[in-house]
Regions:
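Divalent-cation
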Residues: 1-158
Length: 158
């Protein structure tokens, strides 16, 4: 398993499809995942520290975990089958629950949980975005935009 950071959420044009981009912490590969609009909003809110007036589903789930004393230890993006990504939530005691990556990422951002991807998955669909100058956040966003201009979901079909 390789640890990932969330780079951000953007909308791919012209399809108007949200995408979340993750980056290896100690590597150069990126993992793009097409997601739904609601999940994109949940991820963006968590990244920006936005607290809605009423809890969203992922906020509620975080509150339930805290109320029952459950500890989310890891989020793992495990595989892609038939152009669909799969993930699991790993709780204390080794309990694993299947989850969509978008929901897992939204929950991880709210709970401060680390996100991982399986090495074979990154080998299969991870991409390297050409480096320009030393990357700061603006460079990272620009590379992401350039990537979106040249990619489609079909590029990741097995």
């Amino acid at each position: 398993m390789r640890e990932l950071d969330v780079v951000g959420v953007r909308v791919e044009m012209p399809s108007n499809q949200p995408i979340v981009l993750l980056r290896e912490v100690d590597g150069e590969r990126y993992l793009p995942i097409w997601i739904g609009a609601v999940e994109a909003t949940a991820i963006a809110f968590a990244q920006q520290g936005v607290t809605p007036e009423r809890p969203m589903t992922h906020d509620l789930f975080k509150d339930v975990l805290e109320a029952v004393g459950a500890k989310l230890e890891q989020v793992r993006i495990t595989e892609m089958r038939d152009s669909t990504y799969y993930a699991e939530l790993v709780f204390a005691g080794g309990i694993r629950v299947s989850s969509r990556p978008s929901d897992s990422i939204a929950l991880a951002l709210r709970t401060g949980t680390r996100i991982f991807a399986a090495e074979p998955l990154l080998d299969e669909v991870g991409i390297v975005i050409a480096e320009g100058s030393e990357g700061d956040e603006e460079d990272e966003v620009e590379k992401f935009r350039e990537f979106l201009d040249h990619v489609s979901p079909e590029d990741f079909a097995s």
